[in-house]
């Protein structure tokens, strides 16, 4: 059994030779937390932003590869006076003219009903598609964008047409939305078309094509 003197020696800590050398004032550790390199912070921030932008861009490309967004203007050539006048003859002539559709679409945008034209054009694209895989994907996107009640671009369809679409979506085809397309076409014809003919948009086009009177 160790004597009291030996026990005291055992609890006095390591011998002087075993103790680590004391640090000088130059080697002392800083009292506060280590400072970060501002360049590292800048790089991390830029890297994070860059990654988020790239992820968003990849998602957008993936979506656009399935259903290409329609251009804001189908054509850029100005219509002839005769063509502009023909738009007042019938709604069919307006809708069969790429320029007429573009002008009418711009008018619908001012009435916050552009989704009607967008839906009609999307249905036209679907009917021209032959690849069944693409048909399935486009039909799903058209449904989500224009038929779903959760979509901000939902078009106005009656319950009968909606029920028919829900049944057809089990096996989509290029003609899944034919009834809905006709209903929206009729809505634009009866509701928006008469206002378009009296709008400043259409009247200005008529005036541009009117013959100028010459002064003597």
From Swiss-Prot:
InterPro entries on file: RGS, RGS_sf, RGS_subdom1/3, RGS_subdomain_2
Cysteines engaged in disulfide bonds, as pairs: none
Residue positions, PTM Phosphoserine: 24, 97, 151
Residue ranges with Basic and acidic residues bias: 1-19
Cellular compartment(s): Membrane
Domain RGS: 90-206
Pfam families registered for this protein in UniProt: RGS (PF00615)
GO cellular component, one term: membrane
Region ranges (Interaction with GIPC): 207-216
Assigned keywords, A-Z: Lipoprotein, Membrane, Palmitate, Phosphoprotein, Signal transduction inhibitor
Post-translational modifications reported in the UniProt record: Fatty acylated. Heavily palmitoylated in the cysteine string motif. Phosphorylated, mainly on serine residues.
Topology versus the membrane: Lipid-anchor
Chief subcellular location: membrane
Annotated segments matching region Disordered: 1-30
GO biological process: negative regulation of signal transduction
Role summary: Inhibits signal transduction by increasing the GTPase activity of G protein alpha subunits thereby driving them into their inactive GDP-bound form. Binds to G-alpha subfamily 1 members, with the order G(i)a3 > G(i)a1 > G(o)a >> G(z)a/G(i)a2. Activity on G(z)-alpha is inhibited by phosphorylation and palmitoylation of the G-protein.
Subunit structure comment from the entry: Interacts with GIPC PDZ domain. Interacts with GNAO1.
Name assigned to this protein: Regulator of G-protein signaling 19
Organism of provenance: Mus musculus (Mouse)
High-level lineage: Eukaryota, Metazoa, Chordata, Craniata, Vertebrata
């Amino acid at each position: 059994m160790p004597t009291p003197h030996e026990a005291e020696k055992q609890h006095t800590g390591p011998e002087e030779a075993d103790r680590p050398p004391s640090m000088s004032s130059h080697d002392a550790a800083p009292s506060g937390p280590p400072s970060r390199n501002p360049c590292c912070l800048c790089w991390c921030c830029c890297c994070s932003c860059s990654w988020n932008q790239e992820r968003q861009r990849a998602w957008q490309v993936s979506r656009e590869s399935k259903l290409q967004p329609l251009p804001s203007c189908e054509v850029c050539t100005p219509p002839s006076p005769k063509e502009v006048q023909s738009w007042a003859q019938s709604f069919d002539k307006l809708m069969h003219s790429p320029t007429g559709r573009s002008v009418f679409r711009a008018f619908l945008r001012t009435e916050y009903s552009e989704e009607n034209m967008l839906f009609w054009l999307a249905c036209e694209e679907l009917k021209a598609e032959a690849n069944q895989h693409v048909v399935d994907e486009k039909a799903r996107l058209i449904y989500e964008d224009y038929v779903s009640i959760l979509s901000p671009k939902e078009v106005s369809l009656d319950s009968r047409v909606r029920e028919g679409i829900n049944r057809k979506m089990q096996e989509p085809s290029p003609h899944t939305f034919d009834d809905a397309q006709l209903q929206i076409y009729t809505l634009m014809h009866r509701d928006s078309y008469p206002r378009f003919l009296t709008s400043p948009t259409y009247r200005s086009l008529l005036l541009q094509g009117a013959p100028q009177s010459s002064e003597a």
